[in-house]
Amino acid sequence: MTKEQIGQAIAEARKAQGITIRKMAEMAGTSTRAIQAVEKGLYNVGIDTYLKLAQTLNMRLKFEN
């Protein structure tokens, strides 16, 4: 997946759960600006950040070869 696709999946999961960007940022311990950038695929983040966001939304990360 590209960073854009990951961001889109995060945004869709967040919206499906009725979580605002502000609430998501609070839950994940990051800024609203960072959440917006990740969701738009504009922000290169490490796997630890993706993991934190996924855990916040009860998502699973899957690595494929």
Spans of model-derived segments:
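A short, Lys/Arg-rich alpha-helix, primarily the initiator
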Residues: 1-16
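Residues that mark the N-terminal boundary/hinge immediately upstream of a DNA-recognition element
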Residues: 6-9, 20, 46-49
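The alpha-helix within a helix-turn-helix
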Residues: 14, 25, 54
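Short alpha-helical DNA-recognition segment
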Residues: 18-37
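Short, conserved catalytic or interaction motifs in soluble domains
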Residues: 40, 65
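DNA major-groove recognition helix of helix-turn-helix/homeodomain DNA-binding modules
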Residues: 48-64
